[in-house]
């Protein structure tokens, strides 16, 4: 049963994180008449612009987080980012708070160590070889154990921050320093991963709902500097690889529990899949589903966590997304060239409404549907180039 937003009966959804993914979740909640409260560490974040009200605070501050939850009494708490006081969510969940998909999932996936140990050590899934390190000496030993080339990541970071590849011994000290600067909570523990020889990587959006586990068509993507630049759906895979991917994803989401969508990241080599990471929420590469599916990843997330059946996920055909990336400084961003960017049919545009920029920032995305994924990607890239950012 849902109440009516802004009334005593309101069913409240508290978003922890208010970026572009949270904005789309907020819009889907609004479609169902849910009351949306958006939180983030900075004002005028994208989801705040489509919410009923908002709070600005550091969500790693457990006491502030508890105050907001106590004030709002939400039916659902929906994390959109990792940098949250997850121990407090676990504590409040034990007292009856509904955390999406679960406080356990939010806590485990907040850092790479929890989810890697779950996948490799508890579930026995194939992953890259790995070691953890707390200091430089341990780090040097970890690199030696895993062997060069290897990938270094802070255990707590997102969007590629602090990640680098060690290609020779000369890179070791530089990689350590870069990882220490890139962690979400400052300097700290890192993971050293063996370099994987793979054909491609995918995001398998996996929905855990009241009527079972459902899979979206696999999403391929291209990364640059740790961030996705284009994504496409479906990624062509062998039947055996799809079965292996779905098996791996189902094992992971069932271990994490709760209802919602999970972005399961996998490397694929031939018919084999290697588990990489999982996000217990919509995934940035899944923005393509805004044009590729009857229900986007955001609609699926809301449908699942509110306890409604998913039934069937309908895919519309080869589709792509291309990021509109800003690089500059401004507190008054403007955009031009939209008419040129949208001159072709089956082309859509989303501008995220981010209030400012200081350096590099994802500001929007172009979405396309074509007769093949290759054509869709090319068209999305060309359209994205036509958007002019005025700083």
From Swiss-Prot:
Protein name in UniProt: Formate-dependent phosphoribosylglycinamide formyltransferase
Catalyzed chemical reaction(s): N(1)-(5-phospho-beta-D-ribosyl)glycinamide + formate + ATP = N(2)-formyl-N(1)-(5-phospho-beta-D-ribosyl)glycinamide + ADP + phosphate + H(+)
Source organism of the structure: Vibrio vulnificus (strain YJ016)
Keyword match RNA-binding: no
EC number: 6.3.1.21
Pathway membership: Purine metabolism; IMP biosynthesis via de novo pathway; N(2)-formyl-N(1)-(5-phospho-D-ribosyl)glycinamide from N(1)-(5-phospho-D-ribosyl)glycinamide (formate route): step 1/1
Binding of Mg(2+), residues: 265, 277
UniProt similarity note: Belongs to the PurK/PurT family.
GO cellular component terms attached to this protein's record: cytosol
HAMAP family: PurT
Lineage of source species: Bacteria, Pseudomonadati, Pseudomonadota, Gammaproteobacteria, Vibrionales
Annotated TM spans: none
Function statement: Involved in the de novo purine biosynthesis. Catalyzes the transfer of formate to 5-phospho-ribosyl-glycinamide (GAR), producing 5-phospho-ribosyl-N-formylglycinamide (FGAR). Formate is provided by PurU via hydrolysis of 10-formyl-tetrahydrofolate.
